[in-house]
Amino acid sequence: MRRGLLLLNLGTPNNADIRAVKLYLREFLTDKRVIDLPTIPRYILVYCLILPFRSPKSAQAYQSIWTEKGSPLLYHSQNLVTKLQSALKDEYKIALGMRYGTPSITTALAELKDCHSLTILPLFPQYSSAATGSAIEKTLSHLANQEIIPSIKIIRDFYQRPEYIQAQAKIMKPYIKDNFHLLFSYHGIPERHIHKSGCDTLCPQTCTPIYDKNQACYRAQCYQTSLLLAKELQLGTHQYTTAFQSRLGKTPWIKPYTDEIFAELISKGIKNIVVSCPSFVADCLETLEEIGIRAKEQWEKLGGEQFILTPCMNDHPEWIKAIQSIVNEQF
């Protein structure tokens, strides 16, 4: 009998019009792990304040990156599945499930129903409750309703895996130039999520090395990712910076903020930067529009000169090999 491999990602609207984007945002933002408020305040916030104002802006942003093939996140993910299935041959049956939108986790699990074992791989290198935790919870809730539950292995995170670091670094390396500063921009999360992960206090600068207490700290995992990538790329500490993007609302999110770090870099005389987004394995709204368009415009307005965004791993052969190694090690 075949093994099943379930790849999980966040999701994308079905198209870039306001209605589709609003439906997607509604499903996304009402998730209790994303906005961790009690149900009634969460729904009031989402339905009365966020959706009416954010949906048109988000639709416009999606339209700026939408292609003839549709959503970049979706087609990169589908290409990944196709190439990974070819590489793994009959050893695994692979399905893609999106936490929000389509293809759904329910649909993906139906494709894998005849597999005697199931490896669940959320495509988030660093663990966060809002992304990884939510995707795993949704998957397990569906599996709980099956008559026959397969043997299950969950790969919670892989930020420290040499295969991931080496693949990411090889894809980045052609874009790294001697007179450029490297900015690692990770998706941010609210500070309170860090406290809920077991960290009593937030580290003032870089997080301390990973140990038992902060092993589930998203910020610590991101800083460790930067450290490992810089080492693989043979960069000194003065040659790169770590920051966090995509904050929403007025509550404090983990710092430093990507959009605020630009002025600091300019003040240091840095004019040319390369930006990489290691928390995203596939190019999407947050990389292509937020960084590739808006952040680039901000950099140029501040007096910056060259701005290079490295592509995500998408369906790159090095990423395919990395997943093969990570998954096969489970057995």
UniProtKB/Swiss-Prot annotation:
Positions bound to Fe cation: H187, E286
UniProtKB keywords: Cytoplasm, Heme biosynthesis, Iron, Lyase, Metal-binding, Porphyrin biosynthesis
Pfam families associated with the record: Ferrochelatase
GO aspect biological process, one term: heme biosynthetic process
Keyword check for Iron: yes
Presence of keyword Cytoplasm: yes
Disulfide bridge partners, by residue number: none
Broad enzyme group: lyase
Function text: Catalyzes the ferrous insertion into protoporphyrin IX.
NCBIfam families referenced in this protein's UniProt entry, alphabetically: hemH (TIGR00109)
Protein's name according to its UniProt entry: Ferrochelatase
Organism, as annotated: Legionella pneumophila subsp. pneumophila (strain Philadelphia 1 / ATCC 33152 / DSM 7513)
